[in-house]
Amino acid sequence: MSTYAIIKTGGKQVKVEVGQAVYVEKLNVEAGQEVTFNEVVLVGGENTVVGTPLVAGATVVGTVEKQGKQKKVVTYKYKPKKGSHRKQGHRQPYTKVVINAINA
């Protein structure tokens, strides 16, 4: 059974494994640099360790592959019979991280 971990980043929890590429909320790190996630909620595998609320001393290390933006989401509001309408677009920024190691 391969080792996996659940980390907290960007207000979300993400399940990661070594070698996996994950998309997380934007991190202020340049492409090619290493990033360390200290908020590890669970480390699974042969012996599963569940944190209360975090696993003490556990870290997940990854390399930032790229920064980008998701596809545009368009919102449109209008009020009937009033001639009032509003169109707005939004592109959420993300960071693609390749997981290098899970240290438990």
From Swiss-Prot:
Sorted alphabetically, the Gene Ontology BP terms of this entry are: translation
Alphabetic keyword roster: Ribonucleoprotein, Ribosomal protein, RNA-binding, rRNA-binding
| InterPro entries registered for this protein in UniProt | bL21-like, bL21-like_sf, Ribosomal_bL21, Ribosomal_bL21_CS
The UniProt GO MF terms for this protein read: rRNA binding; structural constituent of ribosome
Functionally, this protein is described as follows: This protein binds to 23S rRNA in the presence of protein L20.
Q: What family is it from?
A: Belongs to the bacterial ribosomal protein bL21 family.
Q: What is this protein called?
A: Large ribosomal subunit protein bL21
Query: Source gene?
Result: rplU
